[in-house]
């Protein structure tokens, strides 16, 4: 059986659908190479002295881990000189990073969470890199933050790399979801799962149950029904999973179904959610929808949300379509009664 590398897959998609421009193909390959470098750093862990806090904070007010900083630098260094990008934006940087004038500039914008789930680094649990690609609205002109303010429907590619027992790159360019496993001996990502689909129904949910007392009534209603099991209104037993790493939780859902929820809660009522829209929720929503699932903020499709700022937050409910639609319906019913 012929093994299909990431490069070959992208070239063949370019030939078949003519939707992957050569510059986009090269950009994705550069991101993949950066993910290989990050995977190598993660796998060395304490041997390379990369565990623990960096002693700094990011724009979100979160403590940066050493690997957060390393992963961010790897992605910046790998992508700035290739000529495919006009600018980049990262969870770890307050403002966007425009490609320096000493390098050629391209027609794409890249956004990323360089190391999602970094609180799990020191305990050796799966973490990952999430990325999203947009067209630069005005190629050749000076980049502004407004250029990034595009809804998720404008994404031309989205994906993540999960660093676990295997390193797996999960990608969509708008023609389904495909998974590539890193062959460390060959040094390349190899296609291992094509056209991944999420089942419409599930018996598994992922949410941080310790926050139950802070949830809005629609979320409480949904979880209470799940916990009631066979004797409850759902008539079936549910299992709960929670890794505290969005990449790991979404990867499980893409692999076997389920629903992931990181909802608004009363602890910080002024914030619409915890996760970031532009480089966490949008790329994951694109992947989930391309796999036949759904993704909403409880009120509307995530990819229809119009961004207003780079680090905008959003409530997230995504995964198996029928479950996401049920949770969303509960939110809309609560709105109608209010």
UniProtKB/Swiss-Prot annotation:
One of its GO terms (biological process) is fructose 1,6-bisphosphate metabolic process. GO terms for cellular component: cytosol. This is Fructose-1,6-bisphosphatase class 1 1. Homotetramer. It holds the Pfam family FBPase. Its EC number is 3.1.3.11. HAMAP family: FBPase_class1 (MF_01855). Keywords: Carbohydrate metabolism, Cytoplasm, Hydrolase, Magnesium, Metal-binding. Binds 2 magnesium ions per subunit. Substrate binds at residues 116-119, 208, 274. The gene is fbp1. It comes from Cupriavidus necator (strain ATCC 17699 / DSM 428 / KCTC 22496 / NCIMB 10442 / H16 / Stanier 337). It comes from the Bacteria. It is found in: Cytoplasm.
């Amino acid at each position: 059986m012929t093994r299909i590398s990431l490069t070959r897959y992208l070239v063949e998609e370019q030939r078949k659908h003519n939707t992957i421009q050569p510059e986009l193909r090269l950009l994705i390959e550069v991101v993949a190479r950066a993910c290989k470098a990050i995977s190598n750093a993660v796998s060395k862990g304490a041997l390379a002295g990369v565990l623990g806090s960096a002693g700094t904070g990011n724009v979100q007010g979160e403590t940066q881990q050493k690997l957060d900083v390393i992963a961010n630098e790897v992605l910046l260094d790998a992508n700035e000189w290739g000529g495919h990008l006009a600018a980049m934006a990262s969870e770890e940087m307050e403002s966007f990073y425009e490609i320096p004038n000493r390098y050629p500039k391209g027609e794409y914008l890249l956004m990323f969470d360089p190391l999602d789930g970094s609180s799990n680094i020191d305990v050796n649990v799966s973490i990952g890199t999430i990325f999203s690609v947009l067209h630069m609205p005005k190629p050749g002109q000076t980049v502004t933050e407004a250029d990034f303010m595009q809804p998720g429907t404008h994404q031309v590619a989205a994906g993540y790399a999960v660093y676990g027992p295997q390193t797996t790159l999960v990608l969509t360019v708008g023609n389904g979801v495909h998974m590539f496993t890193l062959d460390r001996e060959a040094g390349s990502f190899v296609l291992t799962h094509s056209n991944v689909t999420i089942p419409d129904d599930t018996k598994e949910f992922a949410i941080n149950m310790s926050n139950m007392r802070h949830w809005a009534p629609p979320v409480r209603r949904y979880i209470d029904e799940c916990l009631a099991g066979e004797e409850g209104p759902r008539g079936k037993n549910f299992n709960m999973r929670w890794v505290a790493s969005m990449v790991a939780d979404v990867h499980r859902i893409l692999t076997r179904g389920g629903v992931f929820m990181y909802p608004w809660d009363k602890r910080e009522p002024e914030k619409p959610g915890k996760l970031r829209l532009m480089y966490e929720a949008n790329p994951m929503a694109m992947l989930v929808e391309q796999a036949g699932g759904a993704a909403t903020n409880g009120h509307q499709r995530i990819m229809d949300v119009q961004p207003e700022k780079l680090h905008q937050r959003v409530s997230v409910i995504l995964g198996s379509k029928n479950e996401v639609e049920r949770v969303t319906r509960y939110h809309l019913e609560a709105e109608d009664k209010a």
